[in-house]
Design a protein with these regions (language model features):
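Helix-to-loop junction immediately C-terminal to a conserved catalytic motif
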Residues: 54
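Conserved ABC ATPase "signature" region
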Residues: 69-70, 117-135
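Catalytic Walker B motif of ABC-type/P-loop ATPase nucleotide-binding domains
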Residues: 165-168
Length: 266
């Protein structure tokens, strides 16, 4: 195992049926302390990669190695321990609506540690301070904006100081100020924790300002990888179409159909 990499995905293939694969022979490496993006069009398999890393789905072939251990071969106790090392930010925050901001962040600390209440209080306030929301600790999720809720979810994802952070579409539905704030926090928190960060996103401009490396996916395969500069210089038409938002290209604008004149009987 190369100790420079916290996480390695080797020859990973997965599908709910063999006739319709979602991931096809994926190979990815995630360097310790790096911020890495998984990018690509909707339905290309990005979120499924995160689910495979967390062992929520079991691949037909291949391995996911976390610190050299295949997460899909761990027993129940081992998998539980591995998941405690993963922080997850879900696409829409997934806050507990019946708990206030403070208790949302305290939840993983109460569930997974035996820390005294006074220490949990201090840790929660520190996490909230890191995302600028210490003053909102007693508010309910219904009382805060979408951008603030995303920051609360971000604080919860780092509650246990995990070495691996995974963010599923963290920029979705955010206004420009909130988007910039979340991007800044992702980069800074990754550096502060020396955590390996995986970022699933469609947002090219904001993402390329904060990531060290990126994979571009299409139809369950990696079609491009490299630093932001290397990817922007790619001559692969599929990569170029996605990164530049071109309406037509390898991904066609028109869904296959008979000629319009024939359809209209002209």
């Amino acid at each position: 195992m190369d100790n420079d990499y916290l996480l390695t995905v080797e020859s990973l293939s997965f599908g709910y049926t063999r006739e319709r694969p979602i991931l096809k022979n994926l190979n990815m490496r995630f360097r310790r302390g790096a911020v890495v993006a998984l990018m690509g069009g909707s339905g290309c398999g990005k979120t499924t990669v995160l689910r495979a890393i967390g062992a929520q789905v079991r691949p037909q072939q291949g391995r996911v190695l976390l610190n050299g251990a295949d997460v899909h071969r761990l027993d129940r106790e081992g998998l539980y321990a591995a998941r405690k090392k993963m922080g997850m930010l879900f696409q829409f925050g997934a806050l507990f609506t019946d708990l206030n901001v403070f208790e949302n962040i305290a939840f993983p600390l109460r569930e997974h540690t035996d820390l005294p209440g006074s220490m949990i209080r201090d840790l929660v306030l520190m996490k909230l301070h890191a995302v600028g929301l210490r003053g909102a600790s007693r508010l309910m999720p219904s009382e805060i904006s979408g951008g603030m809720a995303r920051r609360v979810a971000l604080a919860r994802s780092i509650a246990l100081d995990p070495p691996l952070l995974m963010y599923d579409e963290p920029f979705a539905g955010l206004d420009p100020i909130s988007l910039g704030t979340i991007a800044h926090l992702i980069r800074n928190l990754s550096s502060a924790l020396d955590a390996t960060t995986i970022l699933v996103t469609h947002d090219v401009a904001e993402t390329f300002q904060i990531v060290d490396y990126a994979y571009v996916m299409s139809a369950g395969e990696v079609i491009g990888e490299g630093t932001p500069a290397e990817l922007m210089a790619s001559t692969d038409p599929r990569v170029a179409q996605f990164l530049n938002g071109r309406r037509d290209g390898p991904v066609r604008f028109h869904y296959p159909a008979r000629p319009i004149a024939e359809e209209l009987g002209l």
